[in-house]
């Protein structure tokens, strides 16, 4: 009878009948409940509700469900939600998130109904993943309807509930790399929330004690367990990392540890995650860049790397110029790890020029990472390529001799001396570089750091020999020998230094570079 009646209903009228049927399920009458359940079943199966109608339906079910007692009616509503999730996953998921940002017990019941069969589970998980990944760059708004950042906060709660279901494991495993990254990014996002956004999230839900970042961490743990990584969850717990992820000050360290534990994943999964990270880092700038690079650098510590390394190296070339605070140092540390392994070191050589170019603008910490790496890279080169690279690097290094960091001063002076022996041909250019290094080196002959002072004297001697400058070489040897004997000098090192200007014509030698050549 109802099927005949339904043929004459307009699409807009069908929505009204559906809503009335849902509301009538609250009545205790078995007859009315049975009829209402039949109407809901038929309308859900035969009608393609548009997005605005889906929102009304989901709200109606959410409001009515606590008052529905009949098993027949509850089963009918479950089937309706399953059909809506299958036909209109985007609208259904968004509507239920609007109904309950903090995923109340009623919402949990509805989410479970929506993922009760694998095809719908896959669609719902993909939609939640899309929402998690769409939060970056959205402006703050007090409207949850159009605010993707707020929806992203809400998405972690139902995701946690869904991942606890045994029936979701197959679908979760299929998109594990994407879900894993989305949740780690969400951890970073939730530790940087604006006060207004937190207030919007908690409006009318202040009794719920599970904060947004805790929801995300719970979902991440559930995801790892659902794909058989329970031992990794325990290992992370033992290091106090789950707690660290909750804090803005320590969450990046927590991300590092979680990523490091993922090195035990099968190679196919690791490769997929690396490719996913590279793709994300190639897109427009986002708040995820630092977190993504932290994860990538840890995964690159794996002993087995294939074609994905070429993609990563090309990505590093652009990120060495990133203005993002700390990004240069992060990239350089990842490259340094690759240069220290014979299987991957040579693939990093294409970055040598880019690293050299960044030395001048880099901070001391970044330089301290870059200089040992450049030394390693030079030793992997041969012939003319080595000579040209060494000459270019030698021209940049004297500017680093005066760095505030004694480590950088020491590394740059030692590396400069090494480059003199790597250059073949181009003697005129190298001589110009060597002459320009004399004054910066002389400033550090008595550096407050004894290691730097000793390196400066060795470098000065090396430059003098390279230039075949006899008087300067003699002076450098005297300085080196005198320093070694300073402990035995009457009156100590200070007394010894006070005699050098009268014994050694340093200034005259430096002012007359053409005299006394070997």
Locations of regions flagged by a protein language model:
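Extended HEAT/HEAT-like alpha-solenoid repeat tracts in very large eukaryotic scaffold/adaptor proteins
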Residues: 1, 5, 32-39, 77, ...
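Hydrophobic residues within the alpha-helices of tandem HEAT/HEAT-like
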Residues: 2-6, 21, 25, 36-47, ...
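Short coil/turn segments at helix-helix junctions and helix-capping linkers
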Residues: 8-9, 23-34, 45-49, 60-72, ...
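HEAT/HEAT-like alpha-solenoid repeats
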Residues: 9-25, 49-65, 87-106, 128-137, ...
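Intrinsically disordered, low-complexity regions enriched in proline, serine, glycine
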Residues: 52, 93, 122-124, 140-141, ...
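Short amphipathic alpha-helical segments embedded in low-complexity Lys/Glu-rich regions
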Residues: 98, 112, 148, 172-180, ...
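Alpha-helical repeat/alpha-solenoid scaffolds of the HEAT/ARM/MIF4G superfamily
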Residues: 161-259, 269, 274, 469-474
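Long internal repeat-built scaffold domains in very large eukaryotic proteins
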Residues: 226, 463-469, 485, 492-518
């Amino acid at each position: 009878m109802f099927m005949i009646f339904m043929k004459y209903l307009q699409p807009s009228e069908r929505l009204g009948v559906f809503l009335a049927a849902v509301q009538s399920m609250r009545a205790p009458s078995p007859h009315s409940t049975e009829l209402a359940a039949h109407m809901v079943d038929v309308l859900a199966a035969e009608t393609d509700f548009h997005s605005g109608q889906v929102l009304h339906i989901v709200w109606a079910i959410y409001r009515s469900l606590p008052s529905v007692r009949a098993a027949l009616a509850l089963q009918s509503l479950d089937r309706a939600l399953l059909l809506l999730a299958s036909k209109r996953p985007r609208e259904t998921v968004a509507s239920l998130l609007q109904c309950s940002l903090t995923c109340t017990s009623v919402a949990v019941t509805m989410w479970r109904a929506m993922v009760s069969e694998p095809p719908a589970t896959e669609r719902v998980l993909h939609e939640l993943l899309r929402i998690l990944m769409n939060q970056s760059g959205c402006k703050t708004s007090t409207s949850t309807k159009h605010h993707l950042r707020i929806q992203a906060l809400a998405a972690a709660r139902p995701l946690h509930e869904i991942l606890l279901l045994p029936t979701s494991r197959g679908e979760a495993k299929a998109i594990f790399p994407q879900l894993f990254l989305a949740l780690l990014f969400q951890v970073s996002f939730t530790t940087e929330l604006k006060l207004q956004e937190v207030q919007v999230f908690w409006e009318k839900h202040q009794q719920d004690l599970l904060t947004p970042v805790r929801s995300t961490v719970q979902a991440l743990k559930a995801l790892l367990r659902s794909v058989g990584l329970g031992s990794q969850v325990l290992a992370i717990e033992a290091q106090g990392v789950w707690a660290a992820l909750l804090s803005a000050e320590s969450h990046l360290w927590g991300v590092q540890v979680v990523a490091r534990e993922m090195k035990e994943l099968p190679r196919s999964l690791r490769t997929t995650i690396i490719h996913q990270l590279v793709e994300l880092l190639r897109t427009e700038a986002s708040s995820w860049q630092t977190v993504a690079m932290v994860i990538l650098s840890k995964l690159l510590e794996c002993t087995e790397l294939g074609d994905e390394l070429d993609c990563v190296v090309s990505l590093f070339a652009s990120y060495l110029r990133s203005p993002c605070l700390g990004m240069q140092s992060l990239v350089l540390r990842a490259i340094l790890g690759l240069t220290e392994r014979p299987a991957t070191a040579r693939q990093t050589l294409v970055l040598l020029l880019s690293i050299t170019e960044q030395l001048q603008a880099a901070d001391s910490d970044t330089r301290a990472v870059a200089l040992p790496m450049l030394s390693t890279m030079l030793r992997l080169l041969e012939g003319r390529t080595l000579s040209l690279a060494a000459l270019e690097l030698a021209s940049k290094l004297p500017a680093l001799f005066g760095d505030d960091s004694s480590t950088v001063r020491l590394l740059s002076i030692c590396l400069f001396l090494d480059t003199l022996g790597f250059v073949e041909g181009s003697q005129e250019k190298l001589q110009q570089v060597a002459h320009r290094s004399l004054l910066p080196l002389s400033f550090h002959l008595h550096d407050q750091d004894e290691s730097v002072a000793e390196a400066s004297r060795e470098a000065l001697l090396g430059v003098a020999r390279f230039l075949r400058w006899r008087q300067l070489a003699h002076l450098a040897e005297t300085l080196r020998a005198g320093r070694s004997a300073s402990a035995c000098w009457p009156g100590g090192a200070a007394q010894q230094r006070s005699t050098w200007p009268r014994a050694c014509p340093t200034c005259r030698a430096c002012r007359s570079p053409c005299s006394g050549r070997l």
